[in-house]
Amino acid sequence: MNQEDLDPDSTTDVGDVTNTEEELIRECEEMWKDMEECQNKLSLIGTETLTDSNAQLSLLIMQVKCLTAELSQWQKKTPETIPLTEDVLITLGKEEFQKLRQDLEMVLSTKESKNEKLKEDLEREQRWLDEQQQIMESLNVLHSELKNKVETFSESRIFNELKTKMLNIKEYKEKLLSTLGEFLEDHFPLPDRSVKKKKKNIQESSVNLITLHEMLEILINRLFDVPHDPYVKISDSFWPPYVELLLRNGIALRHPEDPTRIRLEAFHQ
């Protein structure tokens, strides 16, 4: 059994190739005849010179004929079929596997390169994250320390300021009361008992009267110690003219329901 028996199409392929060669030879002979005709025409013209346009036209005509013949040959030519023997199949398989291997190696190389770049990016981002966490921890510690310092400083500062203000107010109050006492003792003294005895309509009382300064201190202390009930009972030690003086000048107010009780006007409110 020979190769032609294994491949029945091989005889047909050989015949097609032979026919194509014969046709190509005929076309070449026709082109040769055309060239001879052109040569004869040139000989008949003699010494006449062809113009550039005629010469170019002749060359173009020849090129068109050559290209037409070549195109016709390729159109009529059928691809040669390779007999699919075991060796051929193995060779084709090896070529395909080799090509596939090269493609896969290229893809693998690309993926490895991308993975390497992603790994570098991940490491860089991780380092950045660690640095940010360290900075955040440091800032938290610093914030906590500053907060404690500010709170301690603020509390101690406020306490010292309030203490200083209270001392200043206390000193000012004592100074004001001292000045007020001196003023009241000079201008509003207690009634002279010798003068009282001369007046027939005034009975001598065994009660010790208090000064206007002492009356005001009682009213002031009551106002600040018991602000919800600042009224004071008018006792026998309060000299009535001084009580009326305080009421007439708006320094003291009577209780709306009990006229025997008075209070100091809240000038500080």
UniProtKB/Swiss-Prot annotation:
Domain of life: Eukaryota
Record-linked InterPro entries: Centromere_CenpK (IPR020993)
Segments of this protein annotated with the region Disordered: 1-20
Keywords from the UniProt entry: Centromere, Chromosomal rearrangement, Chromosome, Coiled coil, Kinetochore, Nucleus
Clinical condition linked: Chromosomal aberrations involving CENPK are a cause of acute leukemias. Translocation t(5;11)(q12;q23) with KMT2A/MLL1.
Site positions (Breakpoint for translocation to form KMT2A/MLL1-CENPK oncogene): 96-97
Subunit composition and interactions: Component of the CENPA-CAD complex, composed of CENPI, CENPK, CENPL, CENPO, CENPP, CENPQ, CENPR and CENPS. The CENPA-CAD complex interacts with the CENPA-NAC complex, at least composed of CENPA, CENPC, CENPH, CENPM, CENPN, CENPT and CENPU. Interacts directly with CENPH.
Major localisation: nucleus
Coiled coil: 22-42, 98-151
Tissue spec. comment: Detected in several fetal organs with highest levels in fetal liver. In adults, it is weakly expressed in lung and placenta.
PANTHER family assigned to the protein according to its UniProt record, in alphabetical order: CENTROMERE PROTEIN K
Name of protein: Centromere protein K
GO biological process: chromosome segregation; kinetochore assembly; mitotic sister chromatid segregation
Family: Belongs to the CENP-K/MCM22 family.
Function description: Component of the CENPA-CAD (nucleosome distal) complex, a complex recruited to centromeres which is involved in assembly of kinetochore proteins, mitotic progression and chromosome segregation. May be involved in incorporation of newly synthesized CENPA into centromeres via its interaction with the CENPA-NAC complex. Acts in coordination with KNL1 to recruit the NDC80 complex to the outer kinetochore.
Biased composition (Acidic residues): 1-10
